[in-house]
UniProtKB/Swiss-Prot annotation:
Pathway: Amino-acid biosynthesis; L-leucine biosynthesis; L-leucine from 3-methyl-2-oxobutanoate: step 3/4. Substrate binds at R87, R97, R124, D214. Coiled coil: none annotated. PANTHER family: D-MALATE DEHYDROGENASE [DECARBOXYLATING]. The keyword Amino-acid biosynthesis applies. It is found in: Cytoplasm. It comes from Mycobacterium marinum (strain ATCC BAA-535 / M). This is 3-isopropylmalate dehydrogenase.
């Protein structure tokens, strides 16, 4: 395996170091290349993501990312110039966000004993919607300012994400929920609903449901156990996945995959928490989400046994840690030792 590592900013290098520690135990011999991308490079050279680096990244099997963002860089510069550009250049059309409440982890929800287990996955479209940069503004700063952000939804883009979601549902509990707002967003909503129904005919064993996005947020709080696989567009997915993380114990336990399902380009795996510059360098950041991202990476590459071993080690750690607060390195060492 050839792995590109982008540790990034803030706590990124700290949590990635522990993720790599676990990877080395479960999958020895990985060929790793570190890439200096983020605020430090931006300040030193003015570069964000050179074309030459993108070309090099394409030669790898996967990318492991830490975190991007620093208060010394204007908001949006690194996010659009690095994160979003990687997603578009490498065609990461699927953003995969598992949501599971692990034994030993407390949810902010007042869950009743006997409630269904919280274990779902969100398949979010990653390269379309309102994040394509299709918009503009005129008369900026005046009382007559007009601003637009156009949501782009293509049949090709929707179909490939929906099909991936059905495939995942077949490997899970065979239930898929489309989340959208087709009573108001009638054009895009119609495309999504018709596509789900059409492709759903190829998967008769998968039970299909639909929820407006506002209803989905309610049910994710009141009855999250009803969900198995959720498929949704870029914007709605961006919102409900963070709610899902909170329901499952916090964003510090949320892993993600930015995936090119065609495998033409390397997919990228990362914890979804930010760079947390306020605690960077203190050795107190929780690397669990970064380690869980390694599990997603291994599973994507077909190394299912190694991925399962990481999952079990993380589950065992979370089940026994209680209220103990461990240093970053100690968490990595404990999970690695469990392997």
């Amino acid at each position: 395996m050839k792995l590109a590592i982008v540790a990034g900013d803030g706590i990124g290098p700290e949590v990635v170091a522990q993720a790599v520690k676990v990877l080395d135990v479960v999958q020895p011999g990985v060929e790793k290349t570190n890439y200096d991308l983020g605020a430090r490079r931006f300040h030193a050279t003015g570069e964000i993501l050179p074309d030459s680096v993108i070309a090099e990244l394409r030669e790898h099997d996967a990318i492991l990312l830490g975190a991007i963002g620093d208060p010394s860089v204007p908001s949006g510069v690194l996010e659009r110039g690095l994160l979003l550009r990687l997603r578009f250049e490498l065609d990461h059309h699927i953003n995969l966000r598992p949501g599971r409440l692990y034994p030993g982890v407390k949810s902010p929800l007042a869950l009743e004993p006997g409630n269904p287990e919280i274990d779902f996955v969100v398949v979010r479209e990653g390269t379309e919607g309102p994040y394509t940069g299709n918009g503009g503004a005129i008369r900026v700063g005046t009382a007559n300012e007009v601003a637009t952000e156009v949501s782009v939804n293509t049949a090709f883009g929707v179909r490939r994400v929906v099909r991936d979601a059905f495939e995942r549902a077949m490997r899970r509990r065979k239930h898929l929920t489309l989340v959208h707002k087709n009573n108001v967003l009638t054009f895009a909503g119609s495309l999504w609903w018709r596509t789900v129904q059409e492709i759903g005919e190829e998967y008769p064993d998968v039970e299909l449901a639909y929820q407006h996005v506002d209803a989905a947020t309610i049910h994710m709080v009141t009855d999250p156990g009803r969900f198995d696989v959720i498929v949704t567009d870029n914007l709605f997915g961006d919102i409900i996945t963070d709610l899902a993380a909170a329901v499952c114990g916090g964003i510090g336990l949320a892993a993600s995959g930015n995936i090119d399902a065609t495998r033409t380009n390397p997919s990228m795996f990362e914890p979804v928490h930010g760079s947390a510059p306020d605690i960077a360098g203190q050795g107190i950041a929780d690397p669990t989400a970064a380690i869980m991202s390694v599990s997603l990476l291994l599973a994507h590459l077909g190394l299912d046994d190694a991925a399962s071993r990481v999952d079990r080690a993380v589950e065992g750690y979370l089940a026994t840690r209680g209220n103990e607060r461990l240093a970053t390195a100690a968490v990595g060492e404990r999970i690695a030792a469990a392997l």
